[in-house]
From Swiss-Prot:
Keywords: Amino-acid transport, Membrane, Phosphoprotein, Transmembrane, Transmembrane helix, Transport, Vacuole. This is Vacuolar amino acid transporter 4. The modification Phosphoserine is found at residues 88, 130, 165. Pfam families: Aa_trans. Residues 221-231 have a biased composition (Low complexity). It is found in: Vacuole membrane. Residues 1-33, 99-121, 200-233 are annotated as: Disordered. It is a multi-pass membrane protein. One of its GO terms (molecular function) is L-tyrosine transmembrane transporter activity. Residues 1-242, 323-326, 395-410, 460-483, 537-561, 643-648, 712-713 are vacuolar. The chain crosses the membrane at residues 243-263, 302-322, 327-347, 374-394, 411-431, 439-459, 484-504, 516-536, 562-582, 622-642, 649-669, 693-711. GO terms for cellular component: fungal-type vacuole; fungal-type vacuole membrane; vacuolar membrane; vacuole-mitochondrion membrane contact site. Involved in amino acid efflux from the vacuole to the cytoplasm. Capable of transporting large neutral amino acids including tyrosine, glutamine, asparagine, isoleucine and leucine.
Length: 713
């Protein structure tokens, strides 16, 4: 018997239940979506795949789903039910794999109608309903059926055409839920299959809800949006759209999910466990999931996002850091730390890929156990608290200089300015949704860029015009043996950005290009750091201040405005820097869910998980606000006590917190997750030895530079 797929394309020959050698020109149509092989499925597939070309193999894998009909789940006592079961399985469980093709814009959206005359050995998809005219025309007989499809579409008044720019934001799990129907149950074994599938769905939803990703639930309005609202996304200005993706990345700092739950205020949502009273057919879940930016960010946007994450206040500390380390030593070490940082970021992504998890802490948990996750999260908290404290000191010193130069109020005590920042930061710390920080942070990035341009202009003017290219007095060209450890900490402080590496790589449309993008970002940041630091140090020599802005002409209106705007920028960026630390600490005090045991009249007990959200309980909300206020006060206090020695404060944060986070933990994770498995536990091979050397070098550097920064200088 010659089996044909309905489009006139030869699939193979079957006689007496045995599969003969298929034709070398065998092609599987793109429109066919599911195939059920009747007899000897494994042998048939193995035999056929061995004779196919790579192109045919890719096409067959891409367009078909194979189901083993010899499985006990598909055996019935009566053969007449066989075709009905096959059609039911195909229609209800196999045809959702291509739904996501809508977003690609060049795939058809198939709609398969079962036919009673379908062969038991091969069921071909027919009656393809596609919005893509090219797909119809490229198929066999497409020129004949093209006008028929158009006529049917035109006569259907209820049919809505999906615009090509509209993305399919409906979650995949929702597709499966909606596919359950009476036609899928009205066949032998239908209830059993539906119960098994429903059980798996509920387990999947329970696991997702119990994890940190549960916090991205949104209201029902997301699927009720019209096509025009989806098209409006493309009209958002490039910089704004790019920065919103930057906020998404910060909401998943180090791979953790720090977005608060988007539960409506009026909801009383619970997640119920299963017992013997659970219904076989549950009601469809109407809870919609907020579409994430995962897998959609272009390479250019990733470059800008990473570059913005590396450029902040650290670059303004580098001219003074060059004075601490010496010019040539500082330039060479800055280039070394750029290469070192790139390698550690790269092996962290490799460790993530080998472990199959998307969180810095979860990688440590999987490879070493809970203790590793604890110290990773602790280091993240210390780093973000240190960054926030440095930002507060920076803001206070620049506001102090601005008020003195413009309003001539004298040098205000830093304690007043610290109290002023506390009053601002406490309400901002109450923000749960990170997207509400978009406008302040967008302005902050604009002011930072403008400030860097002003710094380059004024330092270049002083060096090349005022000093006629002659370096200022006090420049140390070699190594400053007395203060070089302060440079190490400050340089690492400037290069620290490991918290955004994992979420940025996850959000890429083409993650295989991440190493190249990361290399370009590190190279660009290194060139920018060396240029600004060298210009500033040569222009002011030994008189260079901890923050280079304080060396600029204080009577110049542009300098005064930059001091004001840069201070505002850093002040508006501080809540974003503090956000991950607050969420990590808060998650330790408040678990995501609270177990509730519900007893029924028949003495059975059901376990329910109630979200521990402030939107459901005002006491929890204000208790969280109280803890956030305490965290802000602690950070401000740390900043106040470290304000007298800002360069030492920054160096200690870089040495004590950033070195283990950037240079020790990634090497440890890569050693256990990649190097040892690849070499079968042989430590003397190159990769394990390299990871081990990096670990001990990082530990020695952390201990020595931290000690020298605190006690030795």
């Amino acid at each position: 018997m010659v089996t044909n797929n309905g489009d006139g394309e030869h699939l193979g020959i079957r006689r007496n239940g045995n599969l003969r050698h298929p034709s070398n020109n065998m092609k599987i149509p793109r429109r066919a979506q599911s195939t059920v092989l009747n007899s000897n499925p494994f042998y048939s597939r193995k035999y056929s795949m061995s004779t196919l070309t790579p192109r045919d193999i890719c096409r067959s894998v891409d367009s078909r789903v194979f189901v083993d009909m010899s499985s006990p789940n598909f055996q019935t006592l009566e053969d007449p039910h066989r075709d009905e079961i096959i059609n039911s399985v195909r229609l209800n469980y196999l045809n959702s794999s291509k739904r996501s093709s809508v977003s690609h814009g060049n795939e058809a959206i198939p709609r398969v109608n079962p036919t009673k005359n379908s062969s038991a050995s091969t069921i071909a998809a027919a009656n393809v309903d596609s919005d893509d005219d090219e797909t119809n025309l490229s198929s066999a007989g497409g020129d004949i059926t093209h006008d028929i499809y158009k006529l049917v579409k035109a006569e259907d008044p209820k049919r809505l055409r999906r615009p090509r720019s509209m993305e399919n934001v409906t979650p995949k799990i929702e597709h499966h839920t909606k596919l359950s129907s009476a036609s899928g149950l009205n066949v032998p074994g239908g209830f059993r299959r539906e119960f098994i599938v429903n059980k798996k769905r509920q387990e999947h939803q329970l696991n997702d809800s119990a994890s940190s990703d549960f916090t991205s639930h949104e209201s029902d309005s997301i699927n009720q949006s019209s096509p025009s609202s989806n098209q409006d996304i493309d009209k958002v200005p490039f910089l704004t759209r790019n920065f919103l993706e930057f906020l998404y990345v910060f909401g998943h700092f180090a791979g953790e999910s720090f977005e608060d739950d988007f539960i409506p205020d009026s909801s009383n949502m619970m997640i119920r466990g299963e017992d013997e009273r659970s219904a076989l057919l549950s009601r469809p879940d109407h809870m919609k999931v907020l579409p994430s930016a995962k897998g959609t960010t272009s390479t250019k946007k990733v470059f800008l996002i990473l570059l913005k994450s590396f450029i902040g206040t650290g670059v303004l500390f580098l001219p003074n850091a060059f004075h601490n380390g010496g010019l040539f030593f500082s330039v060479s070490m800055l280039a070394f730390f750029g290469i070192y940082s790139y390698w550690c970021y790269y092996i962290l992504v490799q460790a993530k890929s080998s472990c199959g998890v998307s969180s810095f802490g979860d990688i440590g948990l999987k490879l070493y156990g809970p203790w590793m996750r604890i110290i990773i999260l602790f280091s993240l908290v210390i780093t973000q608290v240190g960054f926030s404290g440095a930002y507060m000191i920076f803001t206070a010193k620049n506001l102090q200089a601005f008020l003195d130069n413009v309003f001539h109020v004298g040098v205000l005590p830093l304690s007043y300015l610290m109290v002023f920042q506390t009053i601002i930061f406490i309400p901002l710390s109450f923000i749960r949704n990170i997207s509400k920080l978009s406008l302040p942070s967008l302005l902050a990035n604009f002011f930072i860029m403008a400030g860097l341009v002003i710094v380059i202009i004024f330092t270049a003017k002083r060096l090349f015009f005022d000093l006629m290219g002659t370096p200022a007095m006090g420049v140390v060209y070699g190594l400053n043996a007395d203060r070089w450890t302060l440079f190490i900490g400050t340089a690492i402080f400037a290069f620290e950005g490991i918290g955004l590496i994992i979420p940025v790589q996850d959000s890429m449309r083409n993650p295989e290009k991440f190493p190249l993008v990361l290399a370009l970002v590190i190279l660009t940041a290194t060139i920018l750091f060396i240029s600004i630091a060298t210009l500033g140090y040569l222009a002011y020599g030994s008189n260079v201040q901890t923050v280079i802005l304080l060396n600029l002409p204080q009577s110049n209106i542009f300098v005064n405005l930059i001091q004001l705007f840069y201070s505002i920028a850093i002040m508006l960026s501080t809540p974003l820097q503090l956000f991950p630390a607050i969420k990590i600490i808060e998650n330790k005090f408040f678990p995501k869910f609270t177990k509730i045991y519900v007893k029924h009249d028949d003495l059975t007990t059901r376990v329910e998980l109630r979200p521990n959200s402030g939107k459901l309980n005002w006491k929890i909300k204000w208790l969280k606000n109280f803890i956030r206020s305490i965290i802000v006060i602690i950070v401000v206090s740390i900043a106040y006590f470290g304000s007298d020695n800002l360069d030492k404060f920054v160096s200690v944060i870089g040495s004590l917190a950033c070195i283990p986070l950037v240079y020790i933990y990634p090497s440890m994770l890569h050693l256990r997750g990649n190097s040892l498995p690849e070499t079968k536990g042989e430590f003397w091979r190159f990769k394990p030895m390299l990871d081990t050397i990096l670990i001990f070098f990082g530990i020695a550097s952390m201990l020595y530079t931290s000690y020298q920064s605190i006690f030795g200088v």
